[in-house]
From Swiss-Prot:
Homodimer. One of its GO terms (molecular function) is RNA binding. The gene is tyrS. ATP binds at residue 232. One of its GO terms (cellular component) is cytosol. A motif ('HIGH' region) lies at residues 39-48. This is Tyrosine--tRNA ligase. Gene3D superfamilies: HUPs, RNA-binding S4 domain, Tyrosyl-Transfer RNA Synthetase. It catalyses: tRNA(Tyr) + L-tyrosine + ATP = L-tyrosyl-tRNA(Tyr) + AMP + diphosphate + H(+). PROSITE patterns: AA_TRNA_LIGASE_I, S4. Its EC number is 6.1.1.1.
Length: 418
């Protein structure tokens, strides 16, 4: 299958410039293309993964990727479809974020092998040395204010106000495309659908300043079956950095994907063939309660992002927590699996009677409730049911001398640290 058709079949093409010309270019030989990543945090998140994996698919098809990290544009801020001005960051902060993002991209693109090995570029390399006068004379004169204000991403900000700094962002992104075309013969840009206005600023600059044709592919902004923006868990971004979102948390995110989205996400976020995904779809629809599509999705993406060992660890944590086998997990694994649950500091030398402890830590509201929970068998210490009202936590209950896990009922976990 032609790479363009495969991208379409996987639901990865939202919009393109001249499709016929783009198809022809991809058929005739190796195309150099780029995707830009502005450092707005110290990590990329799941929302970035759609463009990253699309870039990788094109590389596997023989085309050459350039990964542009916006050391300059990250200092300015993209106004596209944002309600308010971004907070400006210091150069030291942005430089640190650039390094982090460059490291993450190397997990997905091949920067070492073959004539189409990926190349990392930073747009601070050309913007850092250009003077304001040169910027206006050599770049700005190719953009009319009318053209710039016609962009949907700008229109939405006109009423509330947009600074010249952010207004000029589209010119900077357009110039990125121009520089990469002149220096590396890059003729295609890939980005999110919210970037269409900025990306076509690049094709316009190429046409007017160099009389060349540039191509654009936008990938869709992914939403779930309810229309909710994809890539957040409990309102928080799902990061690619394991320190910010653990492999276990990412595993759980994919396991909790709705049935209506699971097969579609397999096409977007995995490298399984379309035939393999079709087989999974049939099995999944025959027995949706077994959650095969979610299990495969979690396995493939966690392995892709964090490696096979991290996936196995996340799976083991899931299975042991589900079975209540707390003692089968290390403290490191427990911290990963129970991140975000209520955590209480306990004095090691206190007389930690189970009833007193349940109340003082806030796990229950009263001694009466605590006694009822214990007597009814609803309280577990490190996976062991406790029904003795006189039970006192001892050193033996301190896992690796660091924490104790309390469970109330089937699912409510609490961590006591010493």
């Amino acid at each position: 299958m032609h790479i363009f058709d495969e991208l379409k079949e996987r639901g990865l093409i939202f919009q393109t410039t001249d499709e016929e010309a783009l198809r022809k270019a991809l058929e005739e030989g190796q195309v150099s293309y780029y995707t830009g990543y502005d450092p707005t945090a110290d990590s990329l998140h799941l929302g970035h993964l759609v463009a990253i994996l699309t870039s990788r698919r094109l590389q596997l098809a023989g085309h050459k990727p350039y990964a542009l990290v916006g050391g300059a544009t990250g200092l300015i801020g993209d106004p596209s479809f944002k309600d308010a001005e971004r907070s400006l960051q210091t150069k030291d902060t942005v430089d640190g974020w650039v390094k982090s993002i460059q490291g993450q991209l190397s997990r997905f693109l091949d920067f070492e092998n073959g004539e189409n090995k990926a190349v990392m570029v930073n747009n601070y390399d050309w913007f850092g040395s250009i003077s304001f006068i040169d910027f206006l004379r050599d770049i700005g004169k190719y953009f009319t204010v009318n053209y710039m204000m016609s962009k949907e991403s700008v229109k939405k900000r006109i009423e509330t106000g947009i600074s010249y700094t952010e207004f000029a962002y589209q010119i900077m992104q357009g110039y990125d495309f121009f520089v990469l075309n002149q220096d590396h013969n890059v003729t295609l840009q890939i980005g999110g659908s919210d970037q269409w206005g900025n990306m076509t600023a690049g094709t316009e600059l190429l046409r007017r300043k160099a009389d060349k044709t540039g191509h654009v592919i936008t990938v869709p902004l992914i939403t779930d079956a309810t229309g909710k923006k994809f890539g957040k868990s409990e309102g928080n971004a799902v990061w690619l950095n394991p320190e910010k979102t653990s492999p276990y948390e990412m595993y759980q995110f994919w396991m909790n994907v709705m049935d209506a989205d699971a097969v579609r996400f397999l096409k977007i976020f995995t490298f399984l063939s379309l035939d393999e995904i079709e087989d999974i779809r049939k099995q999944f629809e025959a027995a949706p309660h077994e959650r095969l599509a979610q299990k495969v999705l979690a396995r493939e993406v966690v392995t892709l992002v964090h490696g096979e060992e991290a996936y196995k660890e996340a799976l083991n944590i899931t299975e042991q927590l589900f079975a209540g086998n707390i003692k089968n997990l290390s403290v490191k694994e427990l911290k990963q699996g129970l991140r975000g649950v209520p955590n209480y500091q306990v004095q090691a030398d206190e007389n930690n009677n189970i009833v007193e402890l349940l109340v003082s830590s806030g796990i229950v509201n009263s001694k009466r409730q605590a006694r009822e929970d214990v007597q009814n068998g609803a309280i577990y210490v490190n996976g062991d049911r406790i029904q003795d009202l006189d039970y006192v936590l001892s050193d033996a209950d301190k896992l690796e001398n660091e924490l104790t896990v309390i469970r109330r009922g089937k699912k409510k976990y609490f961590v006591l640290t010493y």
